[in-house]
Amino acid sequence: MFVRKISFQLKPNTFAEFNRTFEKDIVPVLSKQQGFKGEITFATSGSKDVLATSLWDTQKNADLYAGKSYNDVLKMLANVIDGTPKLETTEVLHSTFNEISVAKPVAA
């Protein structure tokens, strides 16, 4: 399994808009991609820093997404991202979770 990690900063006062856009627009795009296994997004309360990870069954499928839909996703986030996101693809070496629950979104 492979992980695409994207880290970026949000523009001021866009936390709620980011959450809406991610849930309404981006998750459906990811879900339609071949080999997509899941997504986890991290943010520190009160911070502009966000780390979004997507899980892929193979490097090939992660790369296909990168060439096919990633730029469209960046366009969807253009109103909330400040600067250029940093992207890295890595292999999952170990995982202990099967299911996780997410925290309720907190207004920034």
Q: What are the residue ranges of the model-derived segments?
A:
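Short, surface-exposed ligand-recognition loops at beta-strand->loop->(often short) alpha-helix junctions
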Residues: 9-22
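Non-catalytic surface loops within mature trypsin-like serine protease
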Residues: 10-12, 58, 91-94
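An amphipathic, aromatic/His-enriched active-site/gating alpha helix that lines ligand/cofactor pockets
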Residues: 24-37, 55-89
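A beta-strand edge to alpha-helix "cap/lid" segment located at domain peripheries
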Residues: 19, 63, 92-94
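Short, well-ordered beta-strand segments in beta-rich or mixed alpha/beta enzyme
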Residues: 3-8, 38-66
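Glycine-rich beta-strand-turn "strand-cap" elements at beta-sheet edges
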Residues: 40-49, 75-108
